[in-house]
């Protein structure tokens, strides 16, 4: 996939999360999708389900359609964290409502794993 109309100075990662709930401190990511627009116009898309290590409340499952059974054999965030951090390296971050929810949730998940793994400095 190519995007030719964006004039990027660095890659832009558009992030969408599905989670066990909306409490950033307590809830966990169960699916992440990242569409990364590179400065050469190419786009990479990665989607991964994640085992949250906790039950998914039925109220959340009814919204996003992801149930405990769907993630029971998936890797944990800790198992994916390093490769995800590498994929997001040097990217600005974007997404719908991302500054209020998705980015804080993502940062919190990285902090649970390793505080030095993911850095928000120099990102927009």
Language model: regions and residue ranges:
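Conserved non-catalytic scaffold segment of RNase H-like nuclease domains
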Residues: 1-122
